[in-house]
Amino acid sequence: MMRAILLHSFAILLLSLISASAAAQIRSPGSHPRYGVELEPHLVVQWAEEPWWDDEGIGVGLRASIPLIDNGPVRTINNNLAISFGLDWAHFDDCGRPYNDLCDADNIWFPVVVQWNFFLSKVVSLFPELGLGIQYSMLDWDGRIPNQCVRIDGVNVCDDDVDDIDLHLVLWFGARFALSNEIAFTVRLGVPSLLLGVSIFL
């Protein structure tokens, strides 16, 4: 199922690029709506950097992106540069093998990224994001901790209320589909997650 979601997301990005090129305004610098901040609530599917096992987590999150350069850094095309701050939460229902449903976990992410937007048309914009993310992982056992429990990735997961903090490089590629100058549907695919949200430009 996860592979199908990723393939569909890639297809959406590819189709958006093809359709946008027909009415491209990428060569018209500054031809995009001005905004002070972009707020984006979204759904989260975390498929990478899972806490101690191979499983997908489902949750919600929020992004706030603030333009740093309104027309640039390349002044000959329609682009801008923003800094983006996020808060994402994902829940993992089970530990996976060998413990299965004996425990579950939660991840909280605090990403800070640079976002480079390319406005291809009045409807479609594409953007890469690169930065760092703080990952806070929590594990909770649903019952008695099994005797065969072992350390995973150097962390003792065999206690109640286990937690761990890590710092990761994060990367997303995204597309926006504008419904108006103030509202857009936004999809991101990258590491560690797939994000589906609605952007509100203020």
Predicted regions and their residues:
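Residues on the lipid-exposed face of transmembrane beta-strands in outer-membrane beta-barrel proteins
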Residues: 41-45, 60-66, 87, 110-116, ...
